[in-house]
């Protein structure tokens, strides 16, 4: 029995978001298990997997040999191994790359479409979940595994939760919150991730950027002390030789259309406009504003003015909830 995604409604900014239950159908789950799973992942992703605690989750990058990200992954321990969450548009292609050397290790890597991904966000999200689970994650324990359910805590843009669980539990949560929460689809979670500065890598932007171009280092997702992994040389060079000239930015404003992932924007230069950047994600809110996540040069002036190509409206830089200072 499958879990049906909720019908879409216009996303709401975090500051005004009522209690909302979100079906995360644009995200997908994979599991990595087996005796060698930790060691195998250690050679494939940017973070120090051996240091990943039982109550932690981390946004890490999986790179090609040139240091470009196939994908980023929300990685955590689950049951007897690891689980990761990434965008559905590239999960299967990314897993093909991740499995390339698995034949030499005791490791099983599989896409998991049996379990359900749900988000709980908005006004009094914690209170809404309190009676449904014995323990909820928080700043001290951002991950709680409770039977078949993994609960992940996010601080930004406001406290919210991501649930990885079976269909029966997803149905139970849905029924418990029916009438109390509004329901929405992945676009609402996408809007919150843009506000939080959490990079969105969809298929169109796979193998285009080194991790630092999307701020993964600022989110604690790169270890510069661990042993080698695929793409490490290029990732290290970007740090120690200052080779990375790009960063992830959060823009907001108006636009007559929502830009698509992979397209560029335009930067105002005096009386003219110059193409710049690559859009990772964008969404239009219920109040008409457009939020855009974009990779651009890391030396942009804070008062720079942008627009969707040939548009009459403008976008401006918004603050991120973390520092990019090394």
Curated annotation (Swiss-Prot):
Domain of life, per lineage: Bacteria
A GO cellular component entry from the record: cytoplasm
A single MF term (Gene Ontology): folic acid binding
Pfam family, one: YgfZ_barrel
Amino acids binding folate: 27, 189
Main location: cytoplasm
Subcellular localization, as worded in the UniProt entry: Cytoplasm
InterPro entries: GCV_T_N (IPR006222), GcvT/YgfZ_C (IPR029043), tRNA-modifying_YgfZ (IPR023758), YgfZ/GcvT (IPR045179), YgfZ/GcvT_CS (IPR017703), YgfZ_barrel (IPR048451)
One record GO biological process: RNA modification
Cystine residue pairs: none
Keywords: Cytoplasm, Folate-binding, tRNA processing
UniProt record similarity statement: Belongs to the tRNA-modifying YgfZ family.
Primary role: Folate-binding protein involved in regulating the level of ATP-DnaA and in the modification of some tRNAs. It is probably a key factor in regulatory networks that act via tRNA modification, such as initiation of chromosomal replication.
Listed PANTHER family: TRANSFERASE CAF17, MITOCHONDRIAL-RELATED
Protein name: tRNA-modifying protein YgfZ
Source organism of the structure: Enterobacter sp. (strain 638)
